[in-house]
């Protein structure tokens, strides 16, 4: 499934080094066998997750844990006792086919290009995503900008295991269309 989470306006960018590290540490902490974050993309004001979960109840509990824990730690980082961080609850979209999975991967990995953080047609992967861990690119792995290390994903579902084998490789220079 594809999960999106947006922060309120006026707060520091999620791509600032100290905020990004805080967010990555929390995502690592919440990642387990029942709720696996297979891929992600951290943007300035929002976050995309591609997850595999045992069921919707696990997703609800884990995402509640992510949002609450991040808000507390983020507020502490900003020197605030409390304060709203998230614009709304998370948005979840189930991925139903290999073509849909390929399109979601392209969108998530290319989101920094869509928002102008990386030149649109550049053969550069976003280091604030797991794009550099993805094996089905149309050419040898291009250079990565910024970011942190993430454990190599071990997808369990056929959609993640075979989507690009069925639908074709992702094109490094491709950027998602604006919505």
Task: Give residue spans per PLM region.
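Short Pro-Cys-Gly-centered "Cys-loop" motif that presents a nucleophilic cysteine in a tight turn
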Residues: 1, 5-45, 52-179
